[in-house]
Amino acid sequence: MMKIKKIAMQLCLSSAVLAAMPAFAAEAVQLSARHYVVKNLNIGDLPVKTIVPITAKTAEQAIAQAQVIASNPNADVAEFRIDLLEFSADTKKVIALGQQLNQILKEKPLIATIRTHNEGGKMTVSDQDYEKIYREYLKKPFMQLLDIEMFRNAGSVAKLTKLVHVKKVLVILSNHDFSK
């Protein structure tokens, strides 16, 4: 069962990254044999990659989880679930923590994710505020990949995707439908 989950995660990540790669070559991201290299990790190569979530409520818990991920050779990528933080609405605190996590993780890529209530997360936010929050994060990008919910307002998704590419960050377009 775990192997299937790893493969599904890797395929989803590769497909989303391939679909959303910017037209230019980013400094930290290189196209290599139709795969993407992020912090020296070739996302498309075998073995499949393991994404481990950071699901903390506090900064201290997030730092502790990142330290465990950083020291685990079986963890390839960390996903920072921002919506689970007690201070998720405070963009300055989130950015500062994201920068710390990125340093702790060293060569392991960091995905920044706000999972909204509509898709099984903890944050309830309008399309306008969702875009505004991500724009704030992108002023000082701390992530290598940004998870954008693909069925939010189409204009917001398009604008965010364009900005993410300008900032040389990869996009993961996601959809979580728990009714199917």
Where do the protein language model's features map onto the residues?
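Active-site-adjacent beta->alpha loops and helix N-cap segments on the catalytic face
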Residues: 86-101, 150-164
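N-terminal signal peptide c-region/cleavage motif recognized by signal peptidases
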Residues: 20-22
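N-terminal amphipathic alpha-helix/helix-capping segment at the start of soluble metabolic enzymes
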Residues: 25-61
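Catalytic beta/alpha-barrel core
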Residues: 79-87, 142-156, 172-180
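Structural preference for beta-strand elements that scaffold enzyme active sites
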Residues: 49-51, 77-79, 109-113, 143-147, ...
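Active-site mouth loops of central-metabolism enzymes
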Residues: 48-65, 116-128, 172-180
